[in-house]
Curated annotation (Swiss-Prot):
Protein origin, superkingdom: Eukaryota
Name recorded for this polypeptide: Transmembrane protein 125
Effect of residue 107 to L: In a breast cancer sample; somatic mutation
Keywords, comma-separated and alphabetical: Membrane, Transmembrane, Transmembrane helix
Phylogenetic placement of the source organism: Eukaryota, Metazoa, Chordata, Craniata, Vertebrata
Any Pfam family the entry gives: TMEM125
Coiled coil: none
Subcellular location: Membrane
Entry GO terms, CC: membrane
Major subcellular location class: membrane
Organism of origin: Homo sapiens
Length: 219
């Protein structure tokens, strides 16, 4: 019995292949959250890229400075979001990360996405407020209509991103306790099954011993 008890903990460990498969499954946890963050990233890339190209293509001598600066900022912001998505996909395909907190940071819906959305919201908000302030500063009675409208739109978009990120973080923090509470119950369930199996094994061994002794006495 002592040898069986010594071999039991070793048998409970997972083989390396199963551990590798489990690491790959870490990237696909919480699919709804991942899909939401992916949609937001695609919207940022498409919106900022299209807006930046539109401003750069309509640059003229009269309004060249602010259109050139704003279009460049929007294009760089779209490039930043795109690079983050490509980097996460490349790291996932290469399977070069074996730590859970690194996967949770880089996967879709993780900490890196929240940081990118925060940076994008701040950049859009600051750019929009700057454009609106510059449009109203020279002549408050007749501000530049295009500059003011672009500034208000960018400020509103940045505010929506920051508000959405705040609500997202509140929702994530609200779901964390329930997940943490569900994990110990799962482990306790597995422990209960293990105890049932061990008890049944001991009972079957005892019955075999009694059967053997009775046969020996009859002989």
């Amino acid at each position: 019995m002592s040898e069986q008890e010594a071999q039991a903990p070793g048998g409970r460990g997972l083989p390396p292949d199963m551990l590798a498969e489990q690491v790959e499954l870490w990237w696909s946890q919480q699919p709804r959250r991942s899909a939401l963050c992916f949609v937001v990233a695609v919207g940022l890339v498409a919106g900022c890229g299209a807006g930046g190209v539109a401003l750069l293509s309509t640059t003229s001598s009269r309004s060249g400075e602010w259109r050139l600066a704003t279009g460049t900022v929007l294009c760089l912001l779209a490039l930043l979001v795109l690079v983050k998505q490509l980097m996460s996909s490349a790291v996932q395909d290469m399977n070069c990360i074996r730590q859970a907190h690194h996967v949770a940071l880089l996967r879709s819906g993780g900490g890196a996405d929240a940081l990118v959305v925060l940076l994008s919201g701040l950049v859009l908000l600051v750019t929009g407020l700057t454009l609106a302030g510059l449009a109203a500063a020279p002549a408050p009675a007749r501000p530049l209509a295009a500059m003011l409208s672009v500034g208000i739109a960018l400020a509103a978009l940045g505010s929506l991103l920051l508000l959405g990120l705040l609500l997202y973080q509140v929702g994530v923090s609200g779901h964390c306790p329930s997940i943490c509470m569900a994990t110990p119950s799962t482990h306790s369930g597995h422990g209960g099954h293990g105890s049932i199996f061990s008890i049944s094994g001991q009972l079957s061994a005892g019955r075999r011993h009694e059967t053997t002794s009775s046969i020996a006495s009859l002989i």
